[in-house]
Amino acid sequence: MTEQKRKIEKLTGVKGMNDILPQDAGLWEFFEATVKSLLRAYGYQNIRTPIVEHTQLFTRGIGEVTDIVEKEMYSFTDALNGENLTMRPENTAAVVRASIEHNMLYDGPKRLWYIGPMFRHERPQRGRYRQFHQVGVEALGFAGPDADAEIIMMCQRLWDDLGLTGIKLEINSLGLAEERAAHRVELIKYLEQFADVLDEDAKRRLYTNPLRVLDTKNPALQEIAQNAPKLIDFLGDESRAHFEGLQRLLLANNIPFKINPRLVRGLDYYNLTVFEWVTDKLGAQGTVAAGGRYDPLIEQLGGKPTAACGWAMGIERILELLKEDDLAPEQEGVDVYVVHQGETAREQAFIAAERLRDTGLDVIFHCSADGAPASFKSQMKRADASGAAFAVIFGEEEVANGTVGVKALRGAGGDGEKNVQQTVPVEGLTEFLINAMVASAEDGDD
């Protein structure tokens, strides 16, 4: 009796957690290089924290009645020691934890930045994923509105550096704790009048986090939210002066903004300044960067009272904007593709490829897909398809004569098939290639 060959099930990735494929990696690298250059220009230092933290960090830091903590965190119990752990849903709390644990603020304020994956258990949709990537800054130890203005200015400069347009700034002030408490009383009184028409989400938040009701996306509740008591009307002199100082600095730097009284953010640690950069090009997920001031957080997590502000931006959303506006850079090919025919030629080609890499050139050495020798024709097709600027050709005849063939490909500009193959001494190969690439680049600039 013969057994039927059992079909092996094809495995796929987790829904909402996406692979970054080679054809997209160039765009990621372009964005990362651009943002890192900007962060250096502002004196920010990189910090890297673990993906997994103690769950308590987020329940204390973000707030127990926030959507993130209540229903979006990937949390689990460590089978080894029973610790409650969570895959980070955001990184501000982790950066603050690290700054306290390692006493980073002992010698004064710090400007820190991070980049990496975050995790939230929510319904995947355009611009919203279960694993997503953020870059963010945390300015720890700065209390004035100038720090708020500077981190906002950084975002504007990044949009300019990337060539992005149509991203608009909205700002608000959440004031101080006592001002929010006074506003909360009046807000609950106001919302209670509409208890019979509030949706389930708003009813759930009414007594736990009523400020978030103002941020509702339900069309039926927009008028109620619009007419609700505004927190900005409850600000005291200190909060008002801080907010006005921020506005003056933004205007002085020609940064247009809109004051949005309903902008409250979804994390409990914010006070005073909050802001969002929004676009209408991404549908419902229009926020591409957001942040503000979180002065209470460092003390709340066990540190000394320290002012702080920062922002985070969703990398996937920004990359989508770059594609939407046709700003994605062309993927660059390598400099050289080395082809060969014959055993001796293969050995010499292998050595030459390494020597070319020693000089800083990017080189692909042709390796057979099936282990059998490939024809020059098939190798040259691969070379042209690779995007390389030049093919370096090793045959038995060339090796015997101490020469190689060099042919410009499409990656060097023009029609690769019509370019003439040249014979070059092996000893002069590197110099020839460098001169040829310089000439090709100059022709491309004309």
Curated annotation (Swiss-Prot):
Its EC number(s): 6.1.1.21
Molecular function as annotated in GO: ATP binding; histidine-tRNA ligase activity
This protein's record includes keyword Zinc-finger: no
Catalytic activity: tRNA(His) + L-histidine + ATP = L-histidyl-tRNA(His) + AMP + diphosphate + H(+)
CDD domains xref list: HisRS-like_core (cd00773), HisRS_anticodon (cd00859)
Positions of transmembrane segments: none
Keywords attached to this entry: Aminoacyl-tRNA synthetase, ATP-binding, Cytoplasm, Ligase, Nucleotide-binding, Protein biosynthesis
InterPro entries: aa-tRNA-synth_II, aa-tRNA-synth_II/BPL/LPL, Anticodon-bd, Anticodon-bd_dom_sf, His-tRNA-ligase, HisRS-like_core, HisRS/HisZ, HisRS_anticodon
Highest rank taxon of the organism: Bacteria
Gene Ontology CC terms: cytoplasm
Principal location: cytoplasm
Annotated GO biological process: histidyl-tRNA aminoacylation
Subunit description: Homodimer.
Family: Belongs to the class-II aminoacyl-tRNA synthetase family.
Protein name: Histidine--tRNA ligase
Originating organism: Burkholderia lata (strain ATCC 17760 / DSM 23089 / LMG 22485 / NCIMB 9086 / R18194 / 383)
Gene it is expressed from: hisS
